[in-house]
Amino acid sequence: MTSLEDNSQLQPEHSTTSFQPPCCRHTHTSDTHEPWRSLLHNAAPKEHIVQLYQDEQFLNRAVCRFAAAALAHGEGVILVPTAAHWEAFCPRLEAEGVDLSAALSQGQLTVVDADELLPRFMGEKMPDAPVFLGLAGEVVARARSRDRYPKVRWWGEMVNVLWERGNATASMALEDLFDQLAHEQEIAIFCSFLMDNFNGEVHTRMLPRLGQNHSHLIPVEDYFRLESAVADALREVVGPVEASVLEKKLLEQYAPPFAMPSSQALLFALRQVVPGVADAVLQRSGTLYRAS
């Protein structure tokens, strides 16, 4: 991993081929079940996307999809991982056709250690907004390489580091700053949280807050399995007739706080409108999703 002053340390020693725009060759899984792949592939400036994950392979696939697509599009890419995750990303990126040494040396890819950058703008418990925006602006300016790569994407997990430390307040304050950064710098931002989408506390406290500073939610890896699990769980909990009426009514009348799969929006709506059955449907949905 590297400091802000030196990106060269990240170049893999074993990669010697000349740089070619990376492509996502390994696309055996249909985007029908995983629309998040298209969302990340085509991430646009000012979009702020959040992923919930428990499986490290899901994290790796999503981040490398986001980064490899940007490199293929001729965009600058900023990654701010922990050292352990950067080590896991490298072989995946190379398998997708990315020449890491060339991407780093040419300035198209900028990688900064999350554990190195985070203390530089954190106060006692909360992020210092002016310091963060100044440091982040420096990273974005580097990624643009004097307008060689005017379009830039950023993925990072400093917000998750704070979340895993138990400092949810600071994590959400930092997300607010990232949302500000996305709009001021006109970049796409993607972040990932180690959260269980079928946890009641996450649905009650964290997802509504994430809806205040994100444009899109990626709640699970397989949207088709989620849709099936939620539909079956709702039928089991309230009965098939009531489930049909309730689903139609909620999806028509309730607008989720940010873009998400319709089945996820249904879980949101249940908690807002019929809280008495929300936890039962959520827990059963999780059981069915994991078993499918």
Annotated model-derived regions:
Residues 2-292:
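Non-catalytic regulatory/interaction regions at protein termini and inter-domain linkers
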